[in-house]
């Protein structure tokens, strides 16, 4: 399924992996997409000695990512190709501590302070250009907070669920069965909605008070000049 050139790129991307990852696959022997899923994941696993596949018979089609023999909370009920292939790669890199899409430390601390358990399910279309950003943001949150789990679901493979939930647009994010978000979304926006629904653990919330000498509000020439002046003077 993967072109030889892409496999060579993946070997370079995965060269620095330190943890051992397993694609824990559960798929029906008669599922029409079984061969496609196994081919994709086995191709990815061939690109690193730190990635393996385990296949179990199941009633549907899904796989979970395990790290060093333990579940990570990230599950795909889909064949993550197309726009979602990057979501799979980033999930592995983030879990290994080498991802590039984490927010700043203050936002990460907010994620860690979320009260759990939180079970998220995101319904996507593999042709959707807005879906990967949401999937990747929620996977990153799952990596940061062990009380969060996240499933990405290809609606085309689970049309019965799409119909039952009356999903009209993608991505559609459900938090413990309750519709949380529909459409394009940024990390901070999604986090704010989760905080509103689940609350935060005050014992884990960031309590450090930061002091600043100056705050630059706005942009334009005046804002740029103020920022340059502050930097030259060593102001915080």
Whereabouts are the PLM-identified features?
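Local sequence-structure signature of Cys/Sec-based thiol-disulfide redox active-site neighborhoods
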Residues: 3-42, 111-152
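Thiol-based oxidoreductase modules, predominantly thioredoxin-like and allied folds used
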Residues: 49-59, 146-160
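Catalytic cores of nucleotide-enabled group-transfer and carboxylate-activating enzymes in metabolic
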Residues: 20, 98, 151, 156-158, ...
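Gly/Ala-rich phosphate-binding loop of Rossmann-like dinucleotide-binding domains
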Residues: 142, 227, 231
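Non-catalytic, surface beta->alpha helical segment in thiol-disulfide oxidoreductase systems
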Residues: 65-99, 174-202
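Glycine-rich FAD pyrophosphate-binding loop
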Residues: 215-217, 231-236
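Beta1/beta-strand and adjacent pyrophosphate-binding region of the FAD-binding site
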Residues: 205-222
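Structural micro-motif
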Residues: 57-74, 159-176
